Amino acid sequence: YVKNNAETVDLNIEKKNENADVQVEYDGKTYNDGKNIPVKVGKNYITVKSTVQGENGQTATLTYRVNVHRRAADKTYYNEAYRNQYHYSVKDGWGNDLNGLVKYKGTYHMFYQFYDDTKWGPMHWAHATSKDLIHWEEQPIALYPDANGAMFSGCIVADEKNTSGLFGDGNEGGLVALITADGNGQRIKVAYSTDEGKTWKKTNKIAADWSKDPLNNRDFRDPKVFRWENKWFMVIAGGPLRIYSSDNLTDWKCESTYADLHTECPDLYPIETKDGVKWVLSRGGRSYKVGDFKQVDGKWKFVADEAYTNSDGVMNFGKDSYAAMT
């Protein structure tokens, strides 16, 4: 995305092969240096071709398409006839599942699934911030698709004591994201931010992978992480529910699995009751079970109360209200 006043863009082209012939094409014209490419309001698809000639005389060409979206004037977006004025909505494009709801150093952060179109597509993580949960400011896209696939649902936690070791040798931490990547199977990637969520660095670490799932089920997504008893815990589903644990947010082991308990976007959190702490297992924000989260035979498990063993409570009656997250 570029702002409305950006009439041209420059592409930063870095050759990994000095013998490559790189050409940039847009609207029938060639821009060999990738500089001063004019862009109109809306989507602009710029073609980048990299051609290399081998020793045998044969050539190979790799073609990229770069989508540069020039915004319309800001005043046009939220003055549309049917634009919701009460709830947050994206300026344009697609938005769905909330992926990282976290308050960090006085700022509320909301990350969510996003694609630059009015239909579902390769997902990004978009980002908005607020000081009061009412007035929101859109931030730059946080996470883009990569070689591991699109960036699907996940969560963000504040690793305040640097248990992950991702923030150097000290005890001061930052924000850590656990993200579903969906390329040739679903797996959980790790990213972190050292500047309070403004920019993100993906690690090469795979926190969990469907190929090592004890249930051998390819529906392995939507991680939600929480801190309890000086440990990190992660619920994963998409299909059947699993619970993992970790000391450092990067190395995880499976604690328990629930082959008959299916959901997307799971959440597990404690609530205070007159009888003590109970745990709520949210199934996508539509229904829930109440029970205990405890160790059974040395493994952490969610044990539903008898009243919820074979049935769920109703969390909301609006089916479009989905993928709730604490």
Q: Where in the sequence are the language-model features?
A:
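Carbohydrate-active catalytic/glycan-binding domains of CAZyme proteins
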Residues: 69-326
